[in-house]
Amino acid sequence: MSLFRTYVRVLSYLNQEKNAFLLICTANITLAIITIAEPILFGHVIDTIADKSDTLVTLAVWMCFGISNIIAYVLVARGADRLAHRCRLTVLEKSFARIISMPLIWHQQRGTSHALHTLLRATDSMSSIWLEFMRQHLSTFVALFVLVPVTFKMNWRLSIVLMVLAILYILIARLVMQKTKNGQAAVEHYHHNLFKHITDSISNVSIVQSYNRITEETSALHQHTNNLLSAQTPVLNWWALASGLNRMASTISIVCVLLLGAFFVIKGQLSVGEVVTFVGFSQLMIGRLDQISGFINLAVSSQAKLQEFFDMEDSTFQTNEPANLPSLPNVKGAIQFHHVTYEFPNSSQGVFDISFEVKAGQTVAIVGPTGAGKTTLINLLQRVYDPTVGYISIDGININSINRESLRKALATVFQDAGLFDRTIRDNISIGKTGATDEELYEATKTASAHDFILKKSKNYDTLVGERGSQLSGGERQRLAIARAILKNAPILILDEATSALDVETEIRVKNAIDCISQNRTTFIIAHRLSTIRNADLVLFLDQGRLIEKGSFQELINKDGHFYKLLKAGGLTINQPATKEKDDNIIPLRKAMAL
C-alpha cells in the first residue's frame, strides 16, 4: 500500500464522526485563508508608519486580527483533540471486539503480544495523524494553494524564489522517503520483537526467577534494543539531514527575498511595506513547508505499523462468518462426526477421517497419548477450527450452518487451564450466566465444592483472583472454572482434564457434582482418570490424529488393543481380557490412580 493510500485510509476512519469532522475542516480552511491576510496587514502597518498616516487604526486592526486568529485556532485545536481521542477509542473498541472474536488459529498464527502491540501502536499513530491533519495538514495545503497566486500577483520575480524553495523541499522529502522506507519497516519489526520479549518474560516471571534467568533475559532485551537502535539510527540520520537541508534552503530563500526586495525598493518598484509583506509570505510558506515535511516524517514512520494494522483488520473481516446465520434451536445433544479431517497449517498434525455418533445424554471419554488430537477434536466441536473435510452435526444440524454464538451457548467448557480473569471471584463465575442471582451463584459453587474456600477469602466473593488466577491455588482455580460451567447449565458439557489440579478428597466431591450435572446432558471428557473412563458410555481412543478404537470401557478392554495397553502402561494391573470361558467384567486394580 502506497503512502498516499495509507494516509487516505487513516482519514477514512473519521467518517464515524462525519459532521464534527466536516465542521472542523471548514473552520480550518477558513482560518488558512484568513491567515494569508496577516502579512498583508503587517505590510500596511509598516507603510503607514513610514508615511505617518493612520498608524494607530491600522495597528489596532492588525492586532485584533491576530488575537481573533489565535482564539479561533485554539477552538479548532480543542475540537480536533476531542474528535481524535473519541475516534481513537472507537477504533480501539471495534478492533478489540473483532480480534477477540477471531478463531483460535488466527491468534496462534499471530501471537497475543503481536496483535496487542499492533493495535495499540497503530491507534496511537492514527490519532496523531488525525490531530495533525485537522490542526495543520489541511490548512497547510489550502494556504499553499491560495498563497501561490497571491504572491505571483504581488511580484512574480520574488515568487520564483519561493517556488524554488518549495521544489527543494519536495525533492529532499522524496529522497529521504526512498532512503528510509525499508529501514522504517525494519524498525517496526524490531519494535515487535522488543515488545514480545518483554511480554514473554514478564508473563513467565516465576520461571525466570526460579531458574535464575534474570541476567540472561535482561541481556536478551539489551540485544533487542541494540537491534532496534541499529535499524533506527540510519532513519533518524536521514531525517536530521533533511531538516538541516530544509533549514539551509529556507535561510537562503529569505536572504534572496530581502536582497531582491531591497533592489526593487531602490528602483522604486516596491515599497518597504510590500517587501515586509513578501518576507511575511516567505516565512508563512517556510512554516507550511516545514509542516509538510513533518507530516511526511510522521506518515513514513507510521506506515509500517499502520500497514500491519490494516492487514490485521482485513483478516478479521475475511474470517468473520456470514451474517444472518440461523441459531441452533432447542438442543437435545445428539452429536455426530462425519468423516471429519482438520490439519493444522504448515504442519502434519491434526485429526483425520474421524467418524462417531453420540446419543443425547451420553458421556464420552476421549483418551490417547499426548498429541493424539484429543483437544483438537473438542475445538472442532466448539468451532474454534472448522473442518477442512467432513462436518459435525448437533441434532442432525451441520454446525457450520449456524452462528457460532448460538452454538457456544449450548456448550459449557472446563479447560485444563482454568482461564480466570483478573477480576473478582463473583465476576469470574458469573461469566457462565450474565445476571445470575446470588442464590444461583452459591448453588453452583457449592456443587463445585468451592463455596467453603471462597468464604475463607478476605472479601469472600468480591476477592480479586489476580492475573490468570495467580492469587488462588491450582485446585481453587479449577473449582471456580467448574462452578462457572455448572452455572451456565448448557445441554452439552466439555471437561478438558477438569479434575487434573484437584486433590483426591476434592476430586471425589467434584466428580460427584460432575456426575450429577452430567445427568440428561451430553458430556465429553478428556481425562486419564480411570474412574471417569470407566463410567463413560463411549470411549474414543485417538493416536496420531486418528480414531483407533471406540466402544465402551469393557469392550475396549476385551479387544486387548491400544486402550488396554495404555491402561497397563499407566501402572494399572488389569486382568486379561474376558474370554468365552470366563465372563468377568471386574477389573481389579493394584492402586487407584490416574493414568
From Swiss-Prot:
Q: Keyword ATP-binding, does the record have it?
A: yes
| UniProt GO molecular function | ABC-type beta-glucan transporter activity; ABC-type oligopeptide transporter activity; ATP binding; ATP hydrolysis activity
Q: Does the keyword Lyase apply?
A: no
Annotated ranges, domain ABC transporter: 335-569
Which InterPro entries does the UniProt entry name for this protein? AAA+_ATPase, ABC1_TM_dom, ABC1_TM_sf, ABC_transporter-like_ATP-bd, ABC_transporter-like_CS, NdvA, P-loop_NTPase, Type_1_exporter
- Gene transcribed to yield this protein: ndvA
Q: Which reaction does it catalyse?
A: [(1->2)-beta-D-glucosyl](n)(in) + ATP + H2O = [(1->2)-beta-D-glucosyl](n)(out) + ADP + phosphate + H(+)
Main localization of the protein? membrane
Q: What does this protein do?
A: Involved in beta-(1-->2)glucan export. Transmembrane domains (TMD) form a pore in the inner membrane and the ATP-binding domain (NBD) is responsible for energy generation.
Its GO CC terms are: plasma membrane
The record lists ATP as bound by G368, P369, T370, G371, A372, G373, K374, T375
- Keywords on record: ATP-binding, Cell inner membrane, Cell membrane, Membrane, Nucleotide-binding, Sugar transport, Translocase, Transmembrane, Transmembrane helix, Transport
Membrane-crossing residue ranges in chain numbering: 21-41, 56-76, 129-149, 158-178, 252-272
**Compartments where found:** Cell inner membrane
Q: Which cysteines are joined by disulfide bonds?
A: none
The record's note on its domains: In NdvA the ATP-binding domain (NBD) and the transmembrane domain (TMD) are fused.
Q: Where in the numbering of this chain does the ABC transmembrane type-1 domain appear?
A: 21-301
State the name under which the record lists this protein.
Beta-(1-->2)glucan export ATP-binding/permease protein NdvA
Q: Which family does it belong to?
A: Belongs to the ABC transporter superfamily. Beta-(1-->2)glucan exporter (TC 3.A.1.108.1) family.
A Pfam family annotated for this chain is ABC_membrane
> Topology in the membrane?
Multi-pass membrane protein
